[in-house]
Amino acid sequence: MKVYNRDSDIEWVSMNFQVPVNAILREYNTIKDSLNIQRPEYDHKDWYAVTLYGYGSDKTKSHWEYRQRGVKPFLTEIGEKCLGTVKWVRSLPYARIDDIRFLVIKPRGYISKHIDVPEHNWLDPLNISLTYPEGSKFILNDKEVPYKAGASIVLNVHYEHYVENNSDEERIHLVVHGKKNKDFWLQASDIPSAINITQETMA
């Protein structure tokens, strides 16, 4: 089994986490009217987000863009309505959670080509697919990321990437930033496109 870490020279790593897709989507459906337009200053189309844990439900950019001395991330009012989702994320092998967000591309929407953090060439966000309608596409460094509903993949967004939703349904992902503990990478998959979906409710 290949051993990964934050500095591994690779675009993404698929993880073997058991994702309670249906249970998370049930909670998402109770708060979907609270979505905010994501990064309206750029040339994206119908990209939305809401924060469950971070610096405010409408503070939907990456956590480091809001970080201030003496201010810690917190469970937002939206997170209070998605306690099962937050509890599941906290069960993952993280030493610290920095943010938890739903990122949604509406039908026929897209995220334009961009690089998140050019100076940080490392594997960072855990990007979990909850729905991935036919016609969806995630291209990272000119390679298509093997997403399907239930896939949990750590991405290196130092590379240029773009996302398309060429369907009539929402594309819904859950994104987590945080400090991974020593056991995190033990959950990496040997199979790049491995998918694990559980229909169980969240414990």
Task: Name these PLM-found stretches.
Residues M1, D7-I10, P146-K148, K182-Q199:
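Catalytic phosphate/metal-binding cores of nucleic-acid and nucleotide-processing enzymes, i.e., regions
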Residues M1-L92:
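Non-heme Fe(II)/2-oxoglutarate
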Residues R101-H120:
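Conserved short histidine dyad/triad with adjacent acidic residue
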Residues V104, E119-G135:
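Short, conserved beta-strand element in jelly-roll/cupin
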Residues S112-H114, S136-I139, L155-D168, V175:
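Short beta-strand His + acidic residue motifs that chelate non-heme Fe in jelly-roll/DSBH
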Residues D124-L130, S152-V154, E169-L186:
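A short hydrophobic beta-strand segment most commonly corresponding to one strand
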Residues S129-K148:
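A short beta-strand-loop-beta hairpin characteristic of the jelly-roll/cupin
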Residues P146-A149, I153-H158:
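Extracellular carbohydrate recognition and processing domains
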